[in-house]
């Protein structure tokens, strides 16, 4: 009996990555700082972030950072029209992707790029393949995001510091 249950369980937990996830998996390995912003055009919290102009300013003031706006739970639509409205889509350090997953139902994605996804907007900061910061539950505060970007430029080494022993 156990033999029959195990294959069904394993098959039910496996999933294929979307093209957006595959592209992002390669991008976050970059030695440069990379921001992944998971959002959807229908989401009022995501819209509120755009209306403040914070994303536009953040992108313009950090040309060395690569920003990925990934529309999720939006039936494959990438939200480019809305990002264009706020001057984000045409920026040279911005890539726009759309995950094909639906907004509702059993096929709604619950993880993206190997991390849990239960709320949008969510903003993740990577450097050299390492997740440096994850803001998972709501609108980002742009001064905080800027501090995280600044901190992510460091090597995070404690060499030469005195031991606490």
Residue ranges and their predicted role:
Residues 2-13:
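Sec-dependent N-terminal signal peptides
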Residues 48-88, 102-108:
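Structural microenvironment flanking redox-active thiols in thiol-disulfide oxidoreductases
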Residues 40-45, 72-77, 100-103, 131, ...:
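Solvent-exposed loop/turn segments at secondary-structure junctions
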Residues 101-147:
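Thiol/disulfide oxidoreductase modules built on the thioredoxin-like
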Residues 17, 148-165:
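Non-globular targeting/processing and membrane-anchoring segments
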Residues 28-47:
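Short active-site neighborhood of thiol/selenol oxidoreductases, capturing the structured segment around
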Residues 30-35, 63-68, 90-93, 120, ...:
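Loop/turn elements at helix/coil->beta-strand transitions in domains of secreted/extracellular proteins
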Residues 17-34, 57:
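A short beta-strand-turn-helix
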């Amino acid at each position: 009996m156990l033999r029959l249950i195990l294959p069904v369980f394993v098959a039910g937990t496996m999933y294929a990555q979307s093209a957006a996830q595959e592209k992002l998996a390669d991008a976050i390995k970059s030695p440069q700082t990379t921001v992944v912003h998971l959002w959807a055009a229908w989401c009022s919290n995501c819209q509120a972030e755009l209306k403040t102009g914070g994303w536009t300013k953040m992108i313009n003031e950090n040309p060395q950072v690569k920003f990925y706006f990934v529309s999720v739970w939006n039936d494959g639509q990438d939200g480019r029209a809305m990002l264009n409205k706020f001057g984000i889509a045409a920026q040279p350090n911005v890539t726009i992707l759309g995950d094909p997953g639906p907004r509702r139902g059993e096929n709604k994605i619950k993880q993206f790029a190997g991390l849990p996804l239960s709320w949008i907007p969510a903003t993740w900061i990577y450097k050299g393949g390492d997740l440096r910061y994850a803001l998972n539950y709501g609108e980002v505060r742009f001064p905080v995001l800027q501090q995280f970007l600044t901190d992510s430029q460091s090597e995070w080494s404690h060499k030469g510091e005195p031991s606490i022993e």
